[in-house]
């Protein structure tokens, strides 16, 4: 998805100046990315006056794109809201951890990083480790975001992820399930999850 803006070479982002990338999101890629991003924000009412949103960054291209889109949204905002860029280290090796830090710096994304022991815990689980990992990650992100005064977390899932989730459910469990563009947390009162790239293909 973000490959249209950023190319990777030996694990490090090779790129133009971040100002040019920011400009390209709303010009060169206006139709492909920006317009669909804005449509999703408005159609599903994802951002309201006074929100403090934790943009959750895994280090991958989708979450990095989300971070840049949210920065641009704030810059061109019609409502007042605040952003925090949250990176959870579930047990990365030092090289991968540093890559995330370096790439965020190159993209001018001021990250807040915190640690968890998810990888260590999941290594000991035999049944459905991916499911357990995803649930634990979500819980840690909600908890840290709430600690920082946020009322929402934003994840980088896009349209392709939505379709994949539907197909996986149909093929493996015989159920039609999908990702919602936003949902209220059942375990963290007052917290909401949003997926601003929901309509971006």
Question: Predicted regions span which residues?
Answer:
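Short, positively charged and aromatic/hydrophobic N-terminal segments
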Residues: 1-14
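ATP-dependent adenylation/nucleotidyltransferase module used to activate substrates
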Residues: 14-168, 172-180
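Short, flexible loop segments at boundaries between secondary-structure elements
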Residues: 178-201
């Amino acid at each position: 998805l973000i490959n249209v803006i950023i190319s990777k070479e030996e694990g490090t982002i090779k790129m133009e100046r971040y100002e040019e990338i920011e400009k390209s999101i709303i010009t060169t890629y206006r139709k492909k990315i920006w317009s669909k991003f804005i449509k999703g924000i408005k159609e599903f009412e994802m951002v309201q006056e006074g929100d403090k949103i934790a943009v959750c960054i895994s280090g991958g291209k989708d979450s990095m794109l989300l971070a840049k889109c949210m920065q641009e949204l704030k810059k061109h905002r019609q409502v007042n809201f605040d952003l925090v860029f949250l990176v959870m280290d579930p047990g990365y090796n030092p090289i991968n951890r540093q890559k995330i830090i370096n790439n965020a710096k190159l993209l001018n994304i001021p990250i807040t990083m915190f640690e968890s022991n998810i990888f260590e815990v999941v290594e000991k689980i035999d049944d459905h480790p991916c499911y357990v990992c995803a649930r634990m990650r979500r819980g840690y992100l909600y908890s840290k975001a709430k600690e920082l005064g946020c009322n929402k977390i934003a994840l980088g899932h896009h349209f392709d992820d939505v379709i994949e989730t539907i197909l996986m459910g149909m093929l493996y469990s015989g159920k039609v399930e999908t990702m919602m563009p936003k949902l209220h947390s059942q375990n963290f009162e007052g917290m909401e999850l949003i997926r601003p790239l929901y309509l971006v293909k």
